[in-house]
A protein has these predicted regions:
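S-adenosyl-L-methionine-dependent methyltransferase catalytic module, highlighting the catalytic core
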Residues: 112-117, 124-218
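Short conserved loop adjoining the S-adenosyl-L-methionine
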Residues: 87-93
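Class I SAM-dependent methyltransferase SAM/SAH-binding core
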Residues: 46, 50-87
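Class I SAM-dependent methyltransferase Rossmann-like catalytic core
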Residues: 5-19
Length: 219
């Protein structure tokens, strides 16, 4: 999800935003021309650069890694150096149409607090995360008795940045409890069995990666 890959046979010289076409369509449905986009943990700025080229968006990234910040500057992507664990207090309410949080929520010390802060500054939030409820993770933990590792979660338990792992069901229940509306949701799978499980409706068991677009429920 949210990796910028180049497929010139399909897009000419413009890179696609997602490896999964469903997710690409889902996100772009919430991005109009000249939309104000905030990319939290923007990396080298490739996503914002692509959206700027495709949709003429007004984008800004937040990143703490200095090398990534330099890459953003070389791509002419506006970027702020900031640690997301310290919040977004210096950003005004309703400053953005959409915020993007890509594979980052599970790394935060206060995931709920960050979500609330993001929804203060943006109307919609697009979140991607690895689903800890996937069948392969469950079976690995059951039969091996150790913290599972996968392509999405490749770290050892003692050096992982993922300090708040959660499942798809955990996420939907959090949204219900906090009065958040799930506008759209998409799933991406590499494994055939994961695709089958997701296809028959067992999404918490089948989904490997999740993209959700959320907003505050209107009072």
């Amino acid at each position: 999800f949210l990796n910028v890959s180049v497929d010139k046979s399909k897009t000419g010289n413009i890179p696609t935003i997602f490896s999964d076409g469903v997710a690409l369509k889902l996100l772009q449905g919430f991005i109009h021309e000249k939309a104000r986009i905030l990319d939290l943990g923007c990396g080298d700025g490739s996503l914002l650069a692509t959206l700027k080229q495709q949709k003429q968006i007004q984008g800004i990234g937040i990143e703490k890694d200095e090398k990534s910040i330099l890459s953003c500057i070389h791509k002419d992507v506006p970027v702020l150096q900031k640690d997301l664990d310290k919040g977004l207090n210096d950003i005004a309410e309703n400053s953005f149409d959409l915020a993007i949080l890509n594979r980052t929520l599970q790394e935060m010390r206060d995931p709920l607090g960050l979500l609330q802060e993001i929804l203060r500054v943006a109307k919609y939030v697009a979140i991607t995360f690895p689903n800890f409820g996937n069948w392969s993770i469950r079976t690995a933990l059951l039969f091996r008795g150790r913290m599972p590792k996968s392509k999405e979660l490749p770290y050892e338990w003692y050096n992982t940045p993922n300090i708040h792992l959660f499942t798809l069901r955990d996420f939907t229940r959090l949204c219900e409890k906090q009065g958040l509306k799930v506008e759209k949701m998409a799933f991406e799978n590499n494994g055939s069995f994961s695709k089958i499980l997701t296809g028959v409706g067992l999404k918490n068991l089948g989904a490997e990666r999740v993209l959700a677009i959320i907003s505050k429920k209107e009072s």
